[in-house]
């Protein structure tokens, strides 16, 4: 089966993957007067008097906006907001299927940061959270930062933080398999876009000390010319040994390789140059930085990728549904670092020590334990850090 052609055929059949379904029915005059006028005036007045009651008297408490400007849709690039709608609809389906969260796609016709921020802020009263999706770097960093400053509901860019949470969960267990720790591992991240930067920050929050980031111009180091603000920040926080050069130079003697970059950029020789017990996560999709079988043949001890046809699939669906479920359940004002760290540990801990192996470092995408475990851990962290309302 050609999955691409079959998917196109199905989308023509479905005519969209979402629909609006009522939670109550209006079949007679009494039901009409309760659901709409005149009875609906009472919940309106209650919310006017107490804004927080919007969470109790409407569906807002379970609603997330899934928002894109169409500028970085999958690996397709800037294809426009309308062309991004199938992805946003798909994301909304995953929210519902994996965590019972009602999500609504919003594809916005602007590339202007302030206009996008203003638009999202103005509609935030209808939702319990904002999930940013497929917004190009470096604009995505600025959009998220500005929204977090003004919104009183969680703002979460899944391409950054969902990826980081799941990568970290996989790495926590991979390092257990090879007898290493976050604190001592030498980590290389190839790809310094939204995902790469977020992974780097998250791993440092989990204890990584020796981290090197590489982009298409080579190893990122302090004082390097032409760095954007995100790369400038990372240049000050990473590369403690002040290494310069290429990806091959970075990988020599490394314990961990994480790829969020481009197909085929890693060779067998690069993997072979890593330390014994190397963990290799080539996650470019659909074609990874190096084929998992090649990485294993070159000496990698543990390999994970973004592909479902290999063991250890590192998939965001393990993170974002449960993270938002937990945030909504405690009515969080933010999704902070402690909540993301809690999510990583919750995912990792679902793999019992007696099950853990090089072939099984992370739960399967359809493991029904994942969403509830992540939600519980995230809500607990939210309450402990003071961002929960209930």
Where are these regions (language model features)?
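N-terminal ligand-binding/catalytic initiation module
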Residues: 1-155, 375, 381, 385-389
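General beta-strand structural signal in soluble alpha/beta enzymes
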Residues: 105, 131-134, 155-158, 189, ...
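Short, ordered loop/turn segments at secondary-structure junctions
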Residues: 69-71, 79, 108-109, 134-140, ...
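Adenosine-phosphate binding glycine-rich loop
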Residues: 158-159, 178-181, 282-390
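Rossmann-like adenosine-cofactor binding region
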Residues: 232-301, 307-309
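Solvent-exposed alpha-helices and their adjacent loops that cap or buttress functional pockets
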Residues: 12, 55-60, 96-97, 122-124, ...
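Glycine-rich phosphate/diphosphate-binding loop of Rossmann-like nucleotide-binding domains
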Residues: 74, 79-99, 157, 161, ...
């Amino acid at each position: 089966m050609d999955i691409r052609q079959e998917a196109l055929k199905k989308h023509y059949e479905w005519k969209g993957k979402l629909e609006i379904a009522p939670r109550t029915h209006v079949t007679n005059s009494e039901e009409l007067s309760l659901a709409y006028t005149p009875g609906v005036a009472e919940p309106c007045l209650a919310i006017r008097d107490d804004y927080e009651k919007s969470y109790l008297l409407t569906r807002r408490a379970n609603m997330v906006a899934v928002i894109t400007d169409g500028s970085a849709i999958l690996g397709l690039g800037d294809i426009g907001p309308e062309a991004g709608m199938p992805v946003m609809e798909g994301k909304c389906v995953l929210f519902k299927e994996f965590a019972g969260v009602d999500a609504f796609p919003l594809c916005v016709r602007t590339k202007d940061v302030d206009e996008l921020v203003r638009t999202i802020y103005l509609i935030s009263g209808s939702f319990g959270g904002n999930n940013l999706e497929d917004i190009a770097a470096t604009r995505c960093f600025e959009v998220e930062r500005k929204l977090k400053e003004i919104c009183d509901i969680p703002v979460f860019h899944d391409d950054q933080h969902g990826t980081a949470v799941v990568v970290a969960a996989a790495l926590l267990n991979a390092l257990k398999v090879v007898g290493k720790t976050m604190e001592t591992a030498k980590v290389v991240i190839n790809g310094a876009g939204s995902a790469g930067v977020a992974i780097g920050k998250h791993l440092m929050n989990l204890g990584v000390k020796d981290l090197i980031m590489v982009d298409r111009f080579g190893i990122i180091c302090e004082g390097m010319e032409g760095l954007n603000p995100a790369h400038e920040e990372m240049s000050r926080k990473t590369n403690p040994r002040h290494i310069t050069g290429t990806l091959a130079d970075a990988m020599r003697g490394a314990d961990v390789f994480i790829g969020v970059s481009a197909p085929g950029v890693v060779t067998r020789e690069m993997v072979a140059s890593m330390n014994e017990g190397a963990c290799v996560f080539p996650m470019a999709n659909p074609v990874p930085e190096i084929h998992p079988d090649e990485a294993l043949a070159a000496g990698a001890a543990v390999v994970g990728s973004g592909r479902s046809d290999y063991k250890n699939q590192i998939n965001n669906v393990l993170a974002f549904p449960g993270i938002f479920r937990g945030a909504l359940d405690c009515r969080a004002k933010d999704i902070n670092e402690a909540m993301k760290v809690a999510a990583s540990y919750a995912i990792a801990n679902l793999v019992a020590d007696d099950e853990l192996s090089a072939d099984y470092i992370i739960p399967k995408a359809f493991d029904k334990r994942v969403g509830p475990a992540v939600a519980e851990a995230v809500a607990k962290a939210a309450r402990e850090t003071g961002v929960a309302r209930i």
